[in-house]
UniProtKB/Swiss-Prot annotation:
Membrane topology designation: Single-pass type I membrane protein
Similarity remark: Belongs to the adenoviridae E3B family.
Parts of the chain on the Cytoplasmic side: 61-91
Protein name, entry field: Early E3B 10.4 kDa protein
Compartmental location: Host endoplasmic reticulum membrane
Residues in compartment: Lumenal: 23-34
Keyword Transmembrane found: yes
Membrane spanning stretches: 35-60
Source species: Human adenovirus B serotype 3 (HAdV-3)
Secretion signal span: 1-22
Length: 91
């Protein structure tokens, strides 16, 4: 079973981006000054970049987990350690 933290972090990143874009969409450009608009743009850019980085890291962790599971299951059954498998959530 795939650990739940992969799903949570995958869902949190798009949620943050959508919430940020929603907040920006309700901001009126006539009401804010130039500094505030640049600060808002920087905030949106940081949120998007951090979310993309988080998704990439999470993807690499998921791929690593899959390869560890495949390597563990390819071992002969007498060499499989159930404690290690439970710790890594491989079974």
């Amino acid at each position: 079973m795939i650990p739940r933290n992969f799903f949570f972090t995958i869902l949190i990143c798009p949620f943050n981006v959508c919430a940020t874009f929603t907040a920006v969409a309700t901001a009126s450009p006539d009401c804010i000054g130039p500094f505030a608009s640049y600060a808002l743009f920087a905030f949106v850019t940081c949120i998007c970049v951090c979310s993309i980085v988080c998704l990439v890291i999470n993807f690499f962790q998921l791929v690593d987990w899959i390869f560890v599971r495949i390597a563990y299951l390819r071992h002969h059954p007498e060499y499989r350690n159930q404690n290690v498998a439970a710790l890594l959530r491989l079974i």
